[in-house]
Regions:
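Conserved ATP-binding subdomain of kinase catalytic cores across diverse folds
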Residues: 2-102, 129-133, 168-171
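C-terminal catalytic region of ATP-dependent kinase domains
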Residues: 158-273
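Conserved kinase catalytic-core segment
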Residues: 108-177
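Short acidic (Asp/Glu) patches
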Residues: 75-83, 106-112, 147
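A short, terminal or domain-edge coil/loop segment
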Residues: 17-23, 90, 119-133, 192-205
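A generic structural signal for residues located within well-ordered alpha-helices
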Residues: 50-54, 120-121, 235
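Aromatic-acidic/polar surface patches that form glycan- and anion
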Residues: 47-48, 115-119, 243
Length: 273
């Protein structure tokens, strides 16, 4: 747990603010290098910071490659203007370490260069766990919503790319009174281009890992949410209950939901012959 935590302590200056994303992050220089900072005062509100932190922490918990990430206190010593014209507020925000690479352009060609191809299956799983519609989903009216720029390919060499999990700010953990969402069958994050890269063994491994998720594991993450992110005690309890219940549901159903059950069954029968 927390294998990818990053703990810079202060922001020295802003390097770039024209990043067109819903939370209007800014590229900053910290005492420990460059990072993308999402601040209080962002146009999406403080709850999105909590969702970002929890979603990234859950990906980290499952062993999925993420950016190094953390919570950093902004003291207001410098003024940080956001792209929408707002001003970053003092208090704790979410930060990820900058990496060399680029967002995905939707091509199969780039997916074939990914060295951690198993993380495609795992990313679909964590998106489905937290009900994150902001990478890929199909709305109820049948219209697909896709954001290629929410898939980052870290460049470790000229030929090899590493898929990195990020951006969970719109995850729908649970709404008050809608506990049934824990048993929702919708698959999130499964771009059509991803389907040929789904791996049966990765799906089985992550399903087995979800079986081990207990309330204490989720509570350890939820308890780290800063008070200024405005998630009260009742909502924290709802998130814990929902995430544990949904982990249990997906541990039994994820393989079927992404269409790999028949493949695994055929392989099992073959192995027994």
């Amino acid at each position: 747990m927390n294998k990818q935590r990053w703990n810079p302590t202060y922001i020295k200056r802003v390097l770039k603010k024209d990043i067109d994303s819903s939370m209007k992050p800014v590229l900053v220089r910290t005492d420990k290098g460059l990072g993308y900072f999402k601040a209080l005062g962002n146009p999406e509100g403080p709850h999105c910071l909590a969702r970002e932190f929890v979603g990234t922490s859950l990906a980290d918990l499952l062993g999925i490659s993420t950016f190094k990430y953390g919570i950093i206190h902004f003291d207001g010593a410098i003024e940080i203007q956001l792209l929408n014209g707002g001003i970053a507020q003092c208090g704790r925000g979410f930060i990820t370490q900058k990496e060399r690479g680029e967002v995905w352009n939707g091509s199969i060609k780039d997916l074939k260069r990914i060295t951690n191809v198993e993380d495609i299956t795992r990313l679909v799983c964590v998106d489905t766990w937290v009900r994150n519609p902001d990478r890929y989903c199909v709305w109820k009216n049948g219209i697909p919503h896709e954001r290629f720029d929410n898939v980052f390919l870290s460049r470790h060499s000229e030929t090899n790319l590493v898929l990195k999990s990020f951006d969970f700010s719109h995850a729908g953990f649970c709404e008050t009174g809608k506990a049934s969402q824990a048993y929702e069958e919708t698959v999130y994050g499964l771009f059509p281009q991803f389907k040929e890269f789904l791996r049966e063994e990765a799906a089985k491994q992550i399903s087995d890992k979800l079986k081990t998720i207990k309330s204490k594991h989720i509570r350890m993450i939820i308890d780290q949410i800063p008070s200024e992110w405005d998630i009260d005690a009742a909502m924290r309890d709802i998130w814990v209950e929902f995430l544990v219940a949904r982990a249990g549901f997906l541990s039994e159903n994820f393989i079927r939901m992404i269409g790999l059950q028949d493949t695994l069954r055929q392989r099992t029968l073959f192995d027994k012959e």
